[in-house]
Amino acid sequence: MELDIDLPDFGPFEGGAPVSEFSSPDNPVFGLDLSGSLHSSVMSVSPTELLLTENLMSAPGSTALTHLTTPSGYDTSPAFTEDWNASPLFAQNDFETAQEWPSLFPDAETSAAPAPALAAPAPVPAAQAEDSPSVDSEDFEPARRPSQARKSSASSSPSGRHSSVSGVSARRRGKPLPPITIDDPSDTVGMKRAKNTLAARKSRARKAERMDELERQVRELEAEKEKLAAELAHWKSLASSQGAAGQ
């Protein structure tokens, strides 16, 4: 089925129809009169340059029209234009004096504060050290013996050797310890503390017995050493006397 539509306002699309009849009625810029010879030299115009006219003060985004011409002044950065104010705080061409700008951080805050001096530990009172359960003269006595042995060995002569040179000295025996008493048998904390105290006493007693046994062995070895030294001196003197007589 064919429909016949009468369009009196539009001319027929024929080869001889003038192009000026199809000009834009809204904007005379787009009304191009190309009725002349088609073989004449006409400059090509891209859609981007058509939109960048004085009548249209803004250009569309880069996604609207592709860039069909060489870069122009409209495509450059606005920072290089004379009428563009990049920041209200700085005037035009004020970037050359950047070294004269005030610092964001004052010099007083940037200077490092001196490190505080380390406080020396406060001395422990003698009464508090004696009352402390972790301080025991018997536990620290073996640690002091090597230094005492070095001092005595450096100051004593070879002829006056005795058991103290080897780091053995008489142990100081304190007063007998009081018996462990528990007032309330239902007190679990007190019972546990009493058991720990009894175990510590037994351990110290075993250590004391072991130290006594070692001291006894050291005394016996010192006596045997002195006896052997005397015999060696006797035999040396006898050998030297016989050698002198044989010569």
From Swiss-Prot:
Residues 214-228 are annotated as: Leucine-zipper. The keyword Lipid metabolism does not apply. GO terms for cellular component: nucleus; transcription regulator complex. Keywords: Activator, Amino-acid biosynthesis, DNA-binding, Nucleus, Transcription, Transcription regulation. InterPro entries: AP-1_TF_bZIP, bZIP, bZIP_sf. GO terms for biological process: amino acid biosynthetic process; nitrogen catabolite activation of transcription from RNA polymerase II promoter; positive regulation of cellular response to amino acid starvation. Residues 192-210 are annotated as: Basic motif. It is found in: Nucleus. Gene3D superfamilies: Classic Zinc Finger. It comes from the Eukaryota. Its main location: nucleus. Residues 107-129, 145-169 have a biased composition (Low complexity). Residues 107-213 are annotated as: Disordered. GO terms for molecular function: DNA-binding transcription factor activity, RNA polymerase II-specific; RNA polymerase II cis-regulatory region sequence-specific DNA binding. Residues 186-247 form the bZIP domain. General amino acid control transactivator. Binds to the AP-1 consensus DNA binding element 5'-[AG]TGACTCAT-3'. Belongs to the bZIP family. GCN4 subfamily. Binds DNA as a dimer. This is Cross-pathway control protein 1. The lineage of its organism: Eukaryota, Fungi, Dikarya, Ascomycota, Pezizomycotina.
